[in-house]
């Protein structure tokens, strides 16, 4: 049986690679799980739930998740400003995959 190498270009076009690109990041999965657990979450609440994340990192990560259509951002025209975040249907569809990864990690921890 001849084994072939998988080229980087070929690997980058797979669904696997695309999925990893969406959840790759120190806090992305934590943010997705926080939104799954609590539903609609305001920015400062999210910061409290996660803890060690900076405001700048939280803001940029939420913008990335919003651009990937995994998170919905709802802004209310009031003073002080009120912004809420929630999972989109697309974001919710990732949760079973993340659950599977967590389950595997729990069973295979060294």
Description of each model-found segment:
Residues 44-73, 80:
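Canonical helix-turn-helix DNA-binding module
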Residues 77, 109-110:
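Short helix-loop hinge/linker segments at domain boundaries
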């Amino acid at each position: 049986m001849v084994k072939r190498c998988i080229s980087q270009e070929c690997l980058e076009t797979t669904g696997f690679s695309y999925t990893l690109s969406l959840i790759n990041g120190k806090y992305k999965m934590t943010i997705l799980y926080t939104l799954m657990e609590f539903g609609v979450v305001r920015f400062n609440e999210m910061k409290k739930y996660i803890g060690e994340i900076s405001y700048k990192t939280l803001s940029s990560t939420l913008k990335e998740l919003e651009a990937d259509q995994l998170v919905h951002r709802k802004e209310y025209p009031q003073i002080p400003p009120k912004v809420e975040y929630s999972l989109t249907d697309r974001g919710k569809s990732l949760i079973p995959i993340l659950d599977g990864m967590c389950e595997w990690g729990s069973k295979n921890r060294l």
